[in-house]
Design a protein with these regions (language model features):
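Phosphate-group recognition and catalysis centered on beta-loop-alpha active-site segments
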Residues: 1-235
Length: 235
C-alpha cells in the first residue's frame, strides 16, 4: 500500500514568490509543505571552494541570498519539523555545505541532492548521517516540446525508462544514494518497485499540475516537488 506522499516546495514556493528567497520559503510553510527544496551555487564557478555560496539555481538570479542567510531563516521556529532538500548545482563545495548544515544543527533534517555522483561519494564520506539523492536526468530543457527534437527525445526517454530502474537500484544498494530525484517523465511503476526493493526513496520533480500530482500520490512515490504547494489541496 502506498504511504503518504511528502509535499515538497520547489525553491520554496516558486509560483507564489520568487524562488530561493525568504518570501518563497515562508509561503511554502504557510501552505503546509513537508520539505523545502532550494539550490546552492558558488558565486564564482571557477572558485567553488572559496567564493560565497548563494541560494540560486543559476547565475541569472540578481540578488540571491547567501547560504548562511537562508539557513539562519530556515532554523526559525515556524520551520520546525520541515525537512530540507539542498540541491547542489555544481561539484566542489560539498564540505562547505556540510559544515554550514552542522553549524545550524540541520544534518538530521536534510537531504542533499545533486546530478553529480562524485559529489554524492564525497558527501557520504564527509557525513554518513546525511540522506543523499541522485538527480536525473542532466538536461537543461524539455526536448519533447519542440517538433525538431520530439522524436529523438522520446526515443531517449523510452531507453532511459528501461535502464533507469536497474541503474538507480544499483546506486542505492551500493550506498551511494538513499533516494532518486527523477523528472516526472521518467517515473514508471517499474522504477518505483526497483527503488523500494533496494530500500530507496523516489522524489519526483517538478510537477505543477494537480491531476498529475494525484496520480503520483496514488502510485506511492515518496515525495512530489512542485512550484505551487497550493495544488496539494486544490479541488
Amino acid at each position: 500500500m502506498p504511504g503518504v506522499t511528502l509535499r515538497v516546495g520547489h525553491k520554496g514556493a516558486g509560483h507564489i514568490a520568487p524562488g530561493n528567497t525568504i518570501p518563497s520559503f515562508d509561503a511554502a510553510v504557510e501552505h503546509g509543505v513537508d520539505m523545502i527544496e532550494f539550490d546552492v551555487l558558488p558565486e564564482d564557478h571557477l572558485a567553488p571552494e572559496t567564493s560565497r555560496l548563494l541560494l540560486a539555481h543559476d547565475y541569472s538570479h540578481a540578488t540571491p541570498l547567501t547560504l548562511e542567510q537562508g539557513l539562519a531563516h530556515l532554523t526559525g521556529a515556524r520551520f520546525a519539523g520541515v525537512e530540507l532538500d539542498v540541491d547542489l548545482k555544481l561539484p566542489g563545495y560539498e564540505r562547505r555545505v556540510v559544515e554550514a548544515l552542522r553549524a545550524h544543527g540541520l544534518i538530521e533534517r536534510t537531504l542533499i541532492s545533486t546530478l553529480y555522483m562524485r559529489s554524492l561519494v564525497v558527501l557520504r564520506e564527509l557525513e554518513p548521517r546525511l540522506r543523499l539523492g541522485w538527480s536525473v536526468p542532466r538536461v537543461s530543457r524539455d526536448y519533447t516540446t519542440s517538433k525538431l527534437t520530439l522524436l529523438p527525445a522520446y526515443a531517449w526517454l523510452l531507453q532511459a525508462r528501461r535502464r533507469l530502474p536497474g541503474i538507480a537500484a544499483g546506486h542505492i544498494r551500493a550506498g551511494r544514494a538513499d533516494a532518486l530525484m527523477a523528472h516526472w517523465r521518467l517515473v514508471t511503476p517499474a522504477l518505483l518497485r526497483a527503488l523500494r526493493d533496494a530500500g530507496g526513496d523516489l522524489y519526483v520533480w517538478t510537477v505543477d499540475d494537480r491531476e498529475q500530482i494525484r496520480r503520483l500520490e496514488a502510485l506511492g512515490v515518496t515525495g512530489v516537488i512542485t512550484n505551487d504547494p497550493r495544488l496539494f489541496d486544490a479541488g
